Amino acid sequence: MGLFDKLFGSKENKSVEVEIYARISGEIVNIEDVPDVVFSEKIVGDGVAVRPIGNKIVAPVDGVIGKIFETNHAFSMESKEGVELFVHFGIDTVELKGEGFTRIAQEGQSVKRGDTVIEFDLALLESKAKSVLTPIVISNMDEISCIVKKSGEVVAGESVVLALKK
């Protein structure tokens, strides 16, 4: 670290504020209320869930799609600021083997906030899934210094659900 870094701070020491937008329209639900311990006990990270309305899951940030599960019920992505996100539709939806889900985006694709990643049939999923609560979690929480969770009704791609400092 040089003299100017000590006086003015280096880029590496500056925190970055990141807003994570709703990936699905609906009502925010506490992550602790998701009926799956993997999410409610924050085993895979901290975040929020949404009780969905509508028929699409969108990119919650500008970034790159990582892995999209073969069954299209979940995906990971990384924001341009390096925040790693995991989006999962419903609980035990993997057991539906892709029924009710249509992949729109592809792994490795650069996306903008609001771009459609997956489309879904909500009526079918409500009738067949254990729950349609849709969690989004930060999987690299060790790099996050502060997380503020929003509440209320949200619109996909338009409403902030999490405000972070990285």
UniProtKB/Swiss-Prot annotation:
Residues that bind Zn(2+): 73, 88
Pfam families, alphabetized: PTS_EIIA_1
PROSITE patterns recorded: PTS_EIIA_TYPE_1, PTS_EIIA_TYPE_1_HIS
SUPFAM superfamilies: Duplicated hybrid motif
Entry-annotated residues carrying Phosphohistidine: 88
Cystine bridges: none
Cofactor comment text: Binds 1 zinc ion per glycerol kinase EIIA-Glc dimer. The zinc ion is important for dimerization.
Sequence ranges assigned to domain PTS EIIA type-1 in this UniProt record: 36-140
Annotated GO biological process: phosphoenolpyruvate-dependent sugar phosphotransferase system
Transmembrane segments: none
Top-level taxonomic group: Bacteria
Residues flagged as site, Important for phospho-donor activity: 73
Subcellular localization, as worded in the UniProt entry: Cytoplasm
PANTHER family listed in its UniProt record: PTS SYSTEM GLUCOSE-SPECIFIC EIIA COMPONENT
Quaternary structure and interacting proteins, as annotated: Heterodimer with glycerol kinase (glpk).
This protein's domain notes: The EIIA domain is phosphorylated by phospho-HPr on a histidyl residue. Then, it transfers the phosphoryl group to the EIIB domain.
Name assigned to this protein: PTS system glucose-specific EIIA component
Organism of provenance: Haemophilus influenzae (strain ATCC 51907 / DSM 11121 / KW20 / Rd)
